[in-house]
Amino acid sequence: MSLSTFSGGSTTACAACKHQRKKCKKNCILARYFPQDGTNKFLNAHKLFGVSNITKMLKRIEESQRDIAMENLIYHANARALDPVGGVYRTICDLKCKIEFVQTELNLTRQQIDMCRSLAQEQHRQRQNLPYRCNSFESLLQQDGDEYVNVDGLDHQNMQQQQEMQQQQQNPSNYDMFLEMPEQTSKVKLEEEKISDQRKNNLMRQILMSSAII
């Protein structure tokens, strides 16, 4: 905050002297900080601290530190005028809340950056390992196995089973012939039984004929 370089004189009075209705001297200690157009600032400071206390404080402070002290005093008085309850304390609390909010947002942003970096590294690793994986997949396709999928997407094992079934339909296997053997054996047995019955009948006829002749 820039401070006025106004110096007291006989014709014009500073805001402090004007408020006190007294003549502003050339060496007025308050004229530098409360010029003629700084009535509101003086009223705020006077209401909070009192003009006599401000004058005593300035006299006790070194001249090189007076500007900084009055800047703080005027700022504190204006803050109390805007917020009679909180004053500067409320301003400090608001600033702390803003700092904490910004700090939290900064931490979240850093976490997002770390996450993006880790994802980028993972994608880079996958791209580096992709050719090796493709080669290994092609080598698996070239192996003589029964449980892999060919280029057309057909199951090699199913194709072999279909071919075997077609061959069985065209050329009956030994297993089918073996299944038919019981039927053939039963037919042979029946024929043998018929032959034995015929023999028995012939023998009976011969016996009967011989008995009749006798």
From Swiss-Prot:
PROSITE patterns: LOB. Residues 12-113 form the LOB domain. Pfam families: LOB. It comes from the Eukaryota. Belongs to the LOB domain-containing protein family. This is LOB domain-containing protein 7. It comes from Arabidopsis thaliana (Mouse-ear cress). The gene is LBD7.
